[in-house]
Curated annotation (Swiss-Prot):
Name under which the protein is recorded: Histone H2B type 2-F
Modified residues (N6-succinyllysine): 35, 117, 121
Modification Omega-N-methylarginine, positions: 87, 93
Glycan attachment points: 113
Residues recorded as bearing N6-glutaryllysine in the entry: 17, 35, 44, 47, 109, 117, 121
Database matches in PANTHER family: HISTONE H2B
Modified residues (N6-(2-hydroxyisobutyryl)lysine): 6, 13, 21, 24-25, 35, 44, 47, 58, 86, 109, 117, 121
């Protein structure tokens, strides 16, 4: 059994920023692989909508899978649209059309308006 004094402390759940070094048997240190996730952003949105509500790690995992799934669907559809129109670049127009095709009714309208707002904010900040 490894000596607990030599091993690095476990990083906090949900926090994927810090790359801690792990002690190997031969004394050399190696970096732990980073796990990318949307947990920080999901948490920020949760606090904007419901400041007094928390989220379990299991629920965060589900939300992370959901965001990854939606991202892949939109990217795939946008890629197809660009290919159909003989374009090599995915622009905000392809993303917007992909969102309209993938999301139902009112949800698509809200997503498009929020996306347009985000792009406008980004463009004006440049």
């Amino acid at each position: 059994m490894p000596d607990p004094a030599k091993s690095a402390p476990a990083p906090k759940k949900g926090s994927k920023k810090a790359v801690t070094k792990v002690q190997k048997k031969d004394g050399k240190k190696r970096k732990r692989s980073r796990k990318e996730s949307y947990s920080v952003y999901v948490y920020k949105v949760l606090k904007q909508v419901h400041p007094d509500t928390g989220i379990s790690s299991k629920a965060m995992g589900i939300m992370n899978s959901f965001v990854n799934d939606i991202f892949e669907r939109i990217a795939g559809e946008a890629s197809r649209l660009a290919h159909y129109n003989k374009r090599s670049t995915i622009t905000s127009r392809e993303i917007q059309t992909a969102v309209r095709l993938l999301l139902p009714g009112e949800l698509a309208k809200h997503a498009v308006s929020e996306g347009t707002k985000a792009v406008t904010k980004y463009t004006s900040s440049k």
